[in-house]
Amino acid sequence: MEKRDSVALHWRLLLLLLLLMPPPTHQGRALRHIDPIQSAQDPPAKYLSNGPGQEPVMVMTIDLTKISKPHSSFEFRTWDPEGVIFYGDTNTEDDWFLLGLRAGQLEIQLHNAWARLTVGFGPRLDDGRWHPVELKMNGDSLLLWVDGKEMLCLRQISASLADHSQRSMRIALGGLLLPTSKLRFPLVPALDGCIRRDIWLGHQAQLSASPRTSLGNCDVDLQPGLFFPPGTHAEFSLQDIPQPHADPWTFSLELGFKLVDGSGQLLALGTGTNSSWLNIHLQNQSVVLSSEAEPKVVLPLDVGLPLQLTLDRVKVVLSQGPKMEVLSMSLLRPASLWRLWSHPQGHLSLGALPGESSSASFCLSDFWVQGQRLDIDQALSRSQDIWTHSCPQRPSNDTRTSH
């Protein structure tokens, strides 16, 4: 009996040791799961987008004669499938490098005297989790690891950094230092994402807090979506979005809500001279449909159910699930409605109208027009503080103001 108890004890100790063993290593370092939530011990994460353009959030200049380690590393997270993580060059004409995302996969574009190439590789990384990335120059070769696994090895693509004819290199985060037209395959530079623990050829990036380079959405729990903080807006030309059906004339759109807070403008149809022909406002967890001086209709809002707006020749219908409110076209001067689509300044706007004071913030899971998903990158103009592919999990003081 004692022998059986002793054997059982040994097995339990062996099992405990196995459970306590460190995980497999990559080049002597333990691989670790990166939690998507920033901990108090981590350095502040940097938001990678400066708005809809290609301007980087920061630019570093590194002296190549003082590099001790040809090695860079960082962690990033995003729900955005396309954009620039970082760009580097010694000159914009014939020696530049880009690491970004396209369709959620990493993509390298490289242009120099030794090689000109574009390569996409690895799994999709637009999953909202932190992913560690490492790059190392080894002579004329570039090696890249993601999540502790070697993903890419490119040989004979460059001179070694020690033999480089140029003495300095620029590294830009979240943007480009050359026109997008000069890329081998153009992409949308703006990336709604965050980067942290970044070391660039032995140099740690320092980013001072400012209205344009704040922590943004890097210090909150995120979910995928399209987030409009208070006071932000996006405007689409009616000529650039899917057109109404002709016979019978109908136009429809659908908004999927994940989060709603505050009161203010949600959506408007109008022109440059009249931005309020048809309005939907958020007010006390309800949506209010109105048109100029006509009577308003109110629909209680259920977050999680799509909100649908349908227009035809005789009515405007606002519905959500089984609930429905109707504005009769006899009150709305139907000719004005049809002329919106032929007017050169006819537009559809989301969020606060320019110059309007609004406390409304909302997260959209989807935005459909005429049965087609509308991308925020199609907007004629938009506020730089819109989160294009992420939303906070819940409203908070941090997200009631812009980046």
From Swiss-Prot:
Cystine links in this protein are 194-218, 363-391
Domain called Laminin G-like: residue spans: 46-218, 225-391
- Keyword Repeat: yes or no? yes
Q: Where is the signal peptide?
A: 1-30
Q: Decide whether keyword Repeat is in the record.
A: yes
Which Gene3D superfamilies does the record cross-reference, listed alphabetically? 2.60.120.200
Q: Which domain of life is it from?
A: Eukaryota
Keywords (A to Z) from UniProt: Disulfide bond, Glycoprotein, Lipid-binding, Repeat, Secreted, Signal, Steroid-binding
Location in the cell: Secreted
Q: What's an example GO cellular component term for this entry?
A: extracellular region
Q: Which residues are glycosylated?
A: 274, 284, 397
**Recorded GO MF terms:** steroid binding
- Output the Pfam families linked to this UniProt entry: Laminin_G_1
**Which PANTHER family does this one have?**
LAMININ G-LIKE DOMAIN-CONTAINING PROTEIN, SEX HORMONE-BINDING GLOBULIN
Quote the subunit structure annotation: Homodimer.
Q: What is this protein called?
A: Sex hormone-binding globulin
| Native source organism of the sequence | Mus musculus (Mouse)
Query: Which gene is the coding source of this polypeptide chain?
Result: Shbg
